[in-house]
C-alpha cells in the first residue's frame, strides 16, 4: 500500500524530467515532472511550480496510488479523445490540430480562450472568436468546447459566450469554467438561461473544472446547481479512486482531462475514463501531442480520435474466456528518453525537496 511508502523509499526510484512544449500552453514552455516507480508500476508527481505543499499532496497521493496500488480494471478498451487548442492565432490552428491525427477523425476540440496578457477584453475576445471560427472551418464535424480557466468576470462571460455561441453554432458543446468561484458560476448559469443564450433553443451547458479540483468541497458545484457537467483530473483530486467517488457522488456527467501530464501520468486519466460507468463526452487526454518528445517510446497520442487503454483486454476476449480481467498499467519510461530530458541537479534537488514537503502534508508525519 502506498501509505507505507516513506520518502526515502520513493526517491530511490524517482526520476525528474523536463519536456519541451511545441507551443506555450497556460504559460508553460517546459513541463517538469517526477516519475515514480513502485511495486505495481509507474506513477507521476507533477504539480505546477506555484502550488504549495498542501495542494501538491493530492498530486503525490495520485502518483503513489498508481505506482503502489495500480490503476484498476477497465470497463472499456478505448477512450474518445478531443484535440486541445492553445491560445494560438488562426494561422497556427491547422498545424496544432494535425498533431491529434487526421482532421476528419477528431471528435471534439477544446479551445483555450481568455488568455491572460493579450490586451483588452475586446482584443482578447476578437482573437478567441477568430480561433474558434478557424477550428470550426477545419473540423466541421467536431464538437467545440471553450475553456476560460475562470478568466472572465460575469459580465465579460455573458458577452463572450453570447458571441462564441453565434460563431460555434450547433457545434458548441459547453463552456468550461468561464468564471472563477462556485457561487459566481451558479449565477452565470442562471443568467445565461434567463437571457436565452444557448444552441438550438437549449441553454448553453456549463462545465466546472477549477471549481471542483481546487475546492475544499468538490461536490458543492453539484449541490448549488452551478454546472451541467464536471471536468475531472486525476492528480489534483488525489487519484483514480477518489475521482471515481467524486463523479459518482456528484450525479453529473464527467469529462476526464489531463493536467498536462507525460504519458505516464496520462495513464491514470485513461484509467479513470475507462472505469466510469458512462462516458458521454470525448475526454481531454490527448495532450501528449503538445510535447516535442515524451518519456515513453510510444507516447499516448490519439489516432482515429481515440486512445487505447494501456493493458486493457481486447473487446470480446474476456467474455469468450480468452483472457482474464485486465489490469491497467502505465507504460514504462524509456531510460534513454528519461536521460535525454533529465533536469539539471539544482532542479532535481528542488523536486526531491518538494516531494518530501508534499509527503509531510499528505501523511501529517511529524518528521520526514
Model-identified regions with their sequence ranges:
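Flexible C-terminal active-site loop/helix
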Residues: 1-15, 19-31, 42, 46, ...
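Active-site mouth loops of central-metabolism enzymes
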Residues: 17-30, 78-94, 113-123, 150-155, ...
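Conserved N-terminal beta1-alpha1 strand-loop-helix module at the mouth
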Residues: 22-79, 129
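Solvent-exposed alpha-helices and their adjacent loops that cap or buttress functional pockets
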Residues: 27-28, 73-75, 100-103, 137-138, ...
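Electropositive phosphate-/nucleotide-binding environments in soluble metabolic enzymes
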Residues: 28, 50-58, 87-90, 122-125, ...
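Catalytic domains of carbohydrate-active enzymes, especially glycoside hydrolases
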Residues: 42-45, 96-117
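Catalytic core of soluble alpha/beta enzymes
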Residues: 111, 116-271, 293-295
Amino acid at each position: 500500500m502506498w501509505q507505507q511508502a516513506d520518502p526515502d523509499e520513493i526517491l530511490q526510484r524517482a526520476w525528474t524530467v523536463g519536456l519541451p512544449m511545441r507551443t506555450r500552453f497556460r504559460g508553460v514552455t517546459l513541463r517538469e515532472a517526477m516519475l515514480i516507480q513502485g511495486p505495481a508500476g509507474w506513477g507521476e508527481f507533477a504539480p505546477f511550480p506555484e502550488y504549495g505543499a498542501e495542494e501538491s499532496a493530492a498530486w503525490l497521493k495520485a502518483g503513489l496510488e498508481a505506482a503502489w496500488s495500480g490503476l484498476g480494471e477497465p470497463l472499456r478498451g478505448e477512450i474518445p479523445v478531443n484535440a486541445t487548442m492553445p491560445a494560438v492565432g488562426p494561422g497556427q490552428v491547422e498545424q496544432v490540430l494535425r498533431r491529434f491525427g487526421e482532421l476528419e477523425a477528431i471528435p471534439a476540440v477544446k479551445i483555450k480562450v481568455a488568455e491572460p496578457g493579450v490586451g483588452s477584453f475586446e482584443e482578447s475576445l476578437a482573437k478567441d472568436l477568430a480561433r474558434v471560427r478557424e477550428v470550426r472551418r477545419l473540423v466541421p464535424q467536431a464538437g467545440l468546447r471553450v475553456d476560460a480557466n475562470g478568466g472572465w468576470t460575469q459580465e465579460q462571460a455573458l458577452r463572450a459566450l453570447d458571441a462564441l455561441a453565434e460563431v460555434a453554432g450547433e457545434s458548441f458543446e459547453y463552456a468550461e469554467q468561464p468564471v472563477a468561484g462556485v457561487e459566481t458560476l451558479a449565477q452565470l448559469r442562471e443568467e445565461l438561461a434567463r437571457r436565452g443564450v444557448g444552441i438550438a433553443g437549449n441553454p448553453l451547458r456549463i462545465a466546472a473544472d477549477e471549481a471542483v479540483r481546487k475546492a475544499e468541497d468538490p461536490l458543492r458545484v453539484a449541490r448549488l446547481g452551478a454546472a451541467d457537467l464536471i471536468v475531472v483530473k486525476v492528480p489534483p483530486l488525489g487519484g483514480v479512486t477518489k475521482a471515481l467517488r467524486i463523479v459518482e457522488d456528484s450525479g453529473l456527467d464527467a469529462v476526464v482531462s489531463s493536467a498536462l501530464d507525460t504519458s505516464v501520468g496520462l495513464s491514470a486519466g485513461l484509467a479513470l475514463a475507462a472505469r466510469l460507468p458512462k462516458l458521454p463526452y470525448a475526454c481531454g487526454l490527448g495532450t501528449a501531442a503538445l510535447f516535442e518528445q515524451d518519456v515513453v517510446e510510444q507516447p499516448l497520442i490519439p489516432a482515429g480520435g481515440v486512445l487505447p487503454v494501456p493493458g486493457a483486454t481486447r473487446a470480446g476476449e474476456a467474455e469468450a474466456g480468452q483472457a482474464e480481467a485486465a489490469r491497467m498499467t502505465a507504460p514504462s519510461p524509456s531510460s534513454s528518453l528519461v536521460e535525454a530530458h533529465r533536469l539539471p541537479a539544482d532542479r532535481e534537488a528542488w523536486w526531491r525537496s518538494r516531494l518530501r514537503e508534499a509527503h509531510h502534508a499528505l501523511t501529517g508525519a511529524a518528521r520526514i
